[in-house]
């Protein structure tokens, strides 16, 4: 006669499967991750919009959002009632970037780029329809650009954002242009899709993007893409500062410095496929 000894721990469900409590927990986790994935690739969605897009009951979405907000993974704008990813989500993302080594490898190059150009150097990645800044080396100048880690900026009105858009897959670019809200920040902001596309073509041809007071009056930014082993634009590096210091006479030398830093940071300059193949 054999004697069965029950191991300590949670009771097992029938046929060794998940119990009701476990299944319910996994479903709740799935819902939370679905909601987090959705708001991470948007510029902000209301509770109603989230419920409609995910075909969830508003009450369920509300419970999940309250839980995510309590952990700092999501947060809402008190004025627009739109939900965004929170600071804890950025820390989680930063952990991945640390593992990839990009931020660590970029630090000395950001410092060197800042010293060569005299302006603040920045590192950023695509985050939904915005640029998420990961690291920076601040200039010693009193008047300077400031993008602390975790700051987000609109793609169409930032140097890194336009550099990433210019090198996006054709189908991805079409989708982003269709979904983006081309908000006007200054008189120089490109709010016409055709004008933005024309600018992106020029950016791709010359190798760097220029934010010419398109986000903040009196401030310029020069950026270049950082490519991964697959030849995809995975991140961007830039220098930002007052237009008075980043004059037209200095653009050539400064853009060369930014492009060189981007090349050094690229994980690999694998040949990019033809646009038709990539689509």
Swiss-Prot record:
- At the top level of its lineage, which domain of life is listed? Bacteria
Q: What GO molecular function terms would the record report?
A: DNA binding; DNA-binding transcription factor activity
State the InterPro entries in the record: GAF-like_dom_sf, HTH_MetabolicPath_Reg, TransRegBhcR, Tscrpt_reg_IclR_C, Tscrpt_reg_IclR_N, WH-like_DNA-bd_sf, WH_DNA-bd_sf
Name listed for the protein in its UniProt record: HTH-type transcriptional regulator BhcR
Which residues are in the HTH iclR-type domain?
26-87
Q: Does the keyword Transcription apply?
A: yes
Q: Where is the composition biased (Basic residues)?
A: 1-13
Q: What does this protein do, in the record's words?
A: Transcriptional regulator of the bhc gene cluster involved in glycolate and glyoxylate assimilation via the beta-hydroxyaspartate cycle (BHAC). Glyoxylate negatively affects the interaction of BhcR with the promoter region of the bhc gene cluster.
Residue numbers of the DNA-binding region are: 47-66
Q: Which UniProt keywords apply?
A: DNA-binding, Repressor, Transcription, Transcription regulation
**Domain annotation IclR-ED: ranges:** 102-271
Q: Where is this region: Disordered?
A: 1-21
Instruction: List other remarks.
Output: The beta-hydroxyaspartate cycle (BHAC) consists of BhcA, BhcB, BhcC, and BhcD enzyme activities. Overall, it converts two molecules of glyoxylate (C2) into oxaloacetate (C4) without the loss of carbon as CO2, under consumption of just one reducing equivalent and regeneration of the catalytic amino donor, which makes it one of the most efficient glyoxylate assimilation pathways.
Which GO BP terms, alphabetically? negative regulation of DNA-templated transcription; regulation of DNA-templated transcription
């Amino acid at each position: 006669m054999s004697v069965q000894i029950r191991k300590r721990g949670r009771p097992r469900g029938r046929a060794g499967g998940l119990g009701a409590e476990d299944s319910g927990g996994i479903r709740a986790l799935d819902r939370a991750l679905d909601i987090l994935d959705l708001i991470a690739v948007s510029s902000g969605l209301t509770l109603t919009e989230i419920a409609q897009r995910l075909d969830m009951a508003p009450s369920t979405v509300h419970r999940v959002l309250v839980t995510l907000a309590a952990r700092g993974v999501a947060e809402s704008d008190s004025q627009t009632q739109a939900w965004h990813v929170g600071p804890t989500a950025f820390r989680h993302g930063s952990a991945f970037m640390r593992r990839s080594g990009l931020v660590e490898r970029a630090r000395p190059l950001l410092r060197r780029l800042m010293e060569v150009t005299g302006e603040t150097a920045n590192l950023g990645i695509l985050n939904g329809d915005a640029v998420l800044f990961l690291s920076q080396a601040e200039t010693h100048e009193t008047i300077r650009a400031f993008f602390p880690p975790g700051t987000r900026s609109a793609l169409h009105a930032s140097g890194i954002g336009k550099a990433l858009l210019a090198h996006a897959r054709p189908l991805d670019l079409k989708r982003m242009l269709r979904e983006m809200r081309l908000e006007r920040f200054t008189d120089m902001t490109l709010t016409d899709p055709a004008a933005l596309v024309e600018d992106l073509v020029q950016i791709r041809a010359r190798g760097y993007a220029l934010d010419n007071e398109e986000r903040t009056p009196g401030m310029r930014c020069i950026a270049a893409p950082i490519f991964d082993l697959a030849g995809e634009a995975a991140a961007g590096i830039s220098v930002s500062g007052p237009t008075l210091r980043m004059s037209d006479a200095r653009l050539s030398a400064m853009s060369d410095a930014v492009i060189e830093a981007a090349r050094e940071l690229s994980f690999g300059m694998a040949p990019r496929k033809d646009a038709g193949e990539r689509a």
